[in-house]
Amino acid sequence: MGRGKIEIKRIENSSNRQVTYSKRRNGIMKKAKEITVLCDAHVSLVIFASSGKMHEYCSPSTTLIDILDRYHKQSGKRLWDAKHENLNNELDRIKKENDSMQIELRHLKGEDISSLHHKELMAIEDALEIGLASVRNKQMEFYKMVKKNQRILEEENKHLNYIVHHQGMPMEAGNVREVESGYHQRAVRDYNPQMPFAFRVQPIQPNLQERI
């Protein structure tokens, strides 16, 4: 006599259900491996037990992502919602932008330019000239800042030397002010000959009142 037909329905006993799941799962995994080898098929299998534990198999010649992409293209079904699609598109855009920037960087370094047209080479030259001008401007700003700091340090050094030169004098509060005042007067005197003639103080003419 043949074996009777088994009714397919949920197994109520949890222990029996777990044993049956384990046997059937191993059988499905075995069949998936066999059809992969015998028929050169691409198979991806994912099984979740009632406990939440996952078991999976994928043909060695492919990946789950590749199979899902092929399914999406051939079936026309949407596997992702609009939010995920927007994120995927944004990732693609960023990747393309990054690739383009990498190419531009190689061109600016003089790499891979043999196949470029004249206009493309001119654009690279313009970009390099703009960058060089920016670097030179920064260098000039730095140079001016260094010269300014140098002048300040030289002035402070002169001030300190003047005070040290007069250190034999009693350094009371009044004398310190006199020393500093003498330094400033000397600085004005040293600077005065360098002033243009038109800005120098002219002596008062003694006979001016008599002429009036």
Swiss-Prot record:
Entry function: Probable transcription factor that may play role in specifying stamen and petal organ identity.
A UniProt-annotated Pfam family: K-box
Note: Over-expression of PI in flowers prevents fruit development leading to non-fleshy berries.
Cell compartment(s), UniProt: Nucleus
One GO term of the biological process aspect: specification of stamen identity
UniProt tissue specificity: Expressed during flower development in stamens and petals.
Taxonomy, superkingdom: Eukaryota
Major subcellular location class: nucleus
A GO cellular component entry from the record: nucleus
Domain MADS-box: 1-61
Gene3D superfamilies according to UniProt: Transcription factor, MADS-box
The protein, known as: Agamous-like MADS-box protein MADS9
Chain ranges of the K-box domain: 84-170
